[in-house]
A protein has these predicted regions:
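Glycine-rich phosphate/pyrophosphate-binding beta-alpha loops
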Residues: 1-26, 108-113
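Short amphipathic alpha-helical surface patches that serve as generic macromolecular interface elements
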Residues: 11, 73, 98-102
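Short, residue-level hotspots on alpha-helical faces of the histone-fold
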Residues: 12, 31-32, 129
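Gly/Pro-rich interdomain helix-loop hinge
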Residues: 17-20, 24-97
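Short, amphipathic C-terminal "tail helix"
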Residues: 95-131
Length: 131
C-alpha cells in the first residue's frame, strides 16, 4: 500500500508529543488500528479489496494458508510484545491527550490514505488500546 494510513496519521501527531521512536509508535498502534480497520470494513464496505489484502497478509505473517485476519492481528500483537515494545502511555503519552490526538489524527494527510474512513470513536478505541 503506497498510501500511508491511520497508523502513520497517529504516529505523526504522537511523535510531536513524546520522545519515542517513530517505529515504536507505529508498532504499538499497528494491531489496534488494523483491528479497527477490519471491523469498519466488515461493517461498512464488506466487498472492499483491503479485506482480502489483510487476509493475505495474515497468511504470510503466520505461514498458514488457513489464517484469518484475526490470526494476523494476533501475530502482530504477539510480535510487538516479544520485541518488548511498550504501550504509548509508558512512552510518555498522557491519556488526557487522547481526544486531542484523535482530532489531529482524523485530519492528518496520512490518515486520508487509510483503506476506510475511521470515525473519531473508532480512532479513539484504537488509540486507547495502544496506550
Amino acid at each position: 500500500n503506497a498510501k500511508l494510513g491511520a497508523v502513520h496519521g497517529f504516529a505523526g501527531v504522537i511523535g510531536g508529543l513524546v520522545p519515542v521512536a517513530h517505529g515504536a509508535i507505529c508498532a504499538a498502534l499497528l494491531a489496534p488500528v488494523t483491528e479497527a480497520n477490519v471491523r469498519a470494513l466488515r461493517e461498512r464496505a464488506a466487498d472492499h479489496p483491503a479485506l482480502a489484502a489483510y487476509r493475505q497478509a495474515a497468511e504470510l505473517l503466520t505461514g498458514r494458508s488457513d489464517a484469518t485476519v484475526e490470526d494476523g492481528v494476533e501475530w502482530i500483537a504477539a510480535t510487538v510484545r516479544q520485541l518488548g515494545i511498550t504501550g504509548l502511555a509508558a512512552g510518555g503519552l498522557d491519556p488526557a491527550l487522547v481526544d486531542e490526538v484523535v482530532d489531529k489524527t482524523g485530519s492528518s494527510s496520512s490518515t486520508k490514505g487509510n483503506p476506510i474512513d475511521l470515525t473519531p470513536a473508532e480512532l479513539q478505541q484504537a488509540l486507547v488500546a495502544a496506550l
